Amino acid sequence: MNISKRITFFLLVCFISLPCIAHRHSGAYAAILENTSDYTDAEKLSRAVEYFQSGKYHEALIWFSKLDKKYKLNPRFQAYMGVCCYYDGEYERAIEALEPILSKLKAFAPHELAVYYYSVADSYFRLNKYIDAVPFYEKHTLLCYNNEKGDSLFRIGICYKHLGDIETAQEYFVEALAYFRRYNDTDRLKYIERELERSTDN
C-alpha cells in the first residue's frame, strides 16, 4: 500500500473513533438540509468527515475551516485540516497549518504523527524547498512503517541531488533501494536504479 493510500486509510480509522461519526444523515434528511445554515455544528463536523472519507478534500476543508473560525479547533482537527490542504494541493497552507502544531501532537501514535510529518515534508518538496523538506522526511522515517521508509529516503536523495550534494544523494538512493527491494516495489526499483546511474554518470 503506497504512502497516499496509507495516509487516507489511517485517518479514516481515526475518524471512526469520533463520536460524531456514529450519527449519519439519511438521504432524505441530507436532501432537506441544503443550506449550511440549516446544519448544527455537530452536523457540519460530521459532513466534513463524510467529505473527507469520500476523498473530497476541498469540500472537507471548507467545512473544517468554517468550524475552526468559530471555535478554533483543537490541534488534532487542525492537523486534519493540514492534511486536507496537502491533498488539495495547497502546499503552503498545509505547512502553515501543520508545522506550528507538530510539537503539540507528540502524544499521538507514531504512525499518525508520521502522516503529519510526511504531509509537511512533501509540501516543502513540491514547493521546491528541498532543504526545508529534508528534516521532515527524516522524522517521517523514524515514525512510519518500514514499507513506507523507502519513499521518504528516496525523496531525501532527490532533495540532496537538487542541492548539488550528489554523494549524499547516492547514499540515500542506495538506502531507499534496499527498502524497495525488500518490499518488491518494482516501479520504484526501476526509477531509483535510473537515478543511481545518472548520479554515477555525473
Task: Identify the role of each PLM range.
Residues S103, K161, I166-N184, K190, ...:
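TPR/TPR-like (Sel1-like) alpha-helical repeat modules
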Residues Y39-K66, K70:
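Alpha-helical segment of the N-proximal tetratricopeptide repeat
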